[in-house]
Curated annotation (Swiss-Prot):
Residue positions with a glycan: T1, T6, S11, T13, N19, T21, T23, T30, S31, N39, T41, T48
Protein name per the record: Glycophorin-A
Keyword Plastid (UniProt): no
Alphabetic keyword roster: Glycoprotein, Membrane, Sialic acid, Transmembrane, Transmembrane helix
PANTHER family linked to this entry: GLYCOPHORIN, GLYCOPHORIN-A
Amino acid sequence: TETPVTGEQGSATPGNVSNATVTAGKPSATSPGVMTIKNTTAVVQKETGVPESYHQDFSHAEITGIIFAVMAGLLLIIFLIAYLIRRMIKKPLPVPKPQDSPDIGTENTADPSELQDTEDPPLTSVEIETPAS
């Protein structure tokens, strides 16, 4: 199984690489540019200790997709907040107002010229119990 790894990409798959042909640069008389690796383990690591094949830059399409997803999420949150605010304006929290409360009926509307009898009627008879002696 031959696994060609080109020198321009600069990436290698971690694991066993056997009989790989690595082409680097232009072949000339002094440097043929072709190097054959047999039965070795090639793991390219950076200073972080993470194999370089795991390190992937985002392509433009992926960045565009991420931005699109973030914007769609923000738009969804904005619409949710706007919907909740609109519902609060349509049906506010029940605060009892004396002019709006339906408990006060309209049958009590009297002429303001008539005097309203707001006091209690006077007591007609007062019985005082005397203790039996």
